[in-house]
């Protein structure tokens, strides 16, 4: 075969980039990779329709996110929005789809059982047990519920560590970004809490993901709370509290959980 002329080779090299579709206005100054990452984020946490991810639906969902995080409603990506999207966070969506969390699911019994079914190698098992009990106590001191640990059988709330796909159609993504997720009260997976085993979990004595803070947040979901848009609340979707050692439930957390269960009287 005769050698292909260099001019033709150069034209063929330029064709893909020359005819590549430009990104929509909503992409702002972001590149294609960040545009696609933003689409995935909005699809997961704001229910951007995966079948109709056009510029208009993207703009609408981005405005919902901007409103949630108290940002100007531009409908356009920015480096700051990308920064928020890349923060470690809970895997539960920030807005409810259909009846998820919107019908105020709650436990009907005043005694809730829980079981720790698997552990992380980052912390001693007894430390995980202590932290889970402490996280539950932060909630129970505000509402007329008590929690009883069981070691065998099926509990109302089952807590464990897993990696990747783990049987609930919500696979973990490896180190960073999604740290954990939980399900609202109900049968089956209802109330269960899953932590990403690929994350590095700590008790606050070293750098890493503070397990007490994450457990308190996820157990809030187990009790029926959705995400709060109050940055001071434990139920805020991203994990960014500066002082993990002395954190406590914010007024927003307390008022929300007491709206579901009432105040503790003793």
Which residues fall in each region the model found?
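Zinc-dependent metalloendopeptidases
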Residues: 2-266
């Amino acid at each position: 075969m005769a050698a292909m002329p260099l001019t033709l080779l150069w034209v063929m090299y330029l064709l893909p980039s020359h005819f590549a579709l430009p990104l929509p206005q909503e992409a702002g100054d972001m590149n294609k990779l960040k545009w696609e990452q933003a689409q995935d984020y909005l699809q997961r946490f704001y229910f951007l329709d995966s079948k109709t991810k056009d510029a208009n639906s993207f703009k609408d969902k981005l405005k919902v996110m901007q409103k949630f995080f108290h940002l100007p409603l531009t409908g356009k990506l920015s480096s700051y929005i990308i920064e928020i999207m890349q923060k470690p966070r809970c895997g539960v969506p920030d807005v409810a789809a259909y009846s998820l969390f919107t019908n105020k699911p709650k436990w009907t019994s005043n005694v809730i059982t829980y079981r720790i079914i698997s552990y992380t190698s980052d912390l001693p098992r007894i430390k995980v047990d202590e932290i889970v009990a402490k996280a539950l106590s932060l909630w129970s001191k505000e509402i007329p519920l008590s929690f009883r640990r069981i070691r065998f059988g099926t509990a109302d709330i089952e807590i464990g560590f897993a990696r990747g796909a783990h049987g609930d159609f919500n696979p973990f993504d490896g180190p960073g970004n999604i740290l954990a997720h939980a399900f609202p009260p109900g049968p089956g997976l209802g109330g269960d809490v899953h932590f990403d085993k690929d994350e590095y979990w700590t008790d606050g004595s070293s750098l890493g993901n503070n397990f007490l803070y994450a457990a308190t947040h996820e157990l809030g979901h187990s009790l029926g709370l959705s995400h709060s848009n109050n940055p001071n609340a434990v139920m805020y979707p991203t994990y960014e509290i500066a002082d993990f050692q002395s954190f406590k439930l914010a007024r927003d957390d307390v008022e929300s959980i007491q709206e579901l269960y009432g105040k503790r009287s003793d």
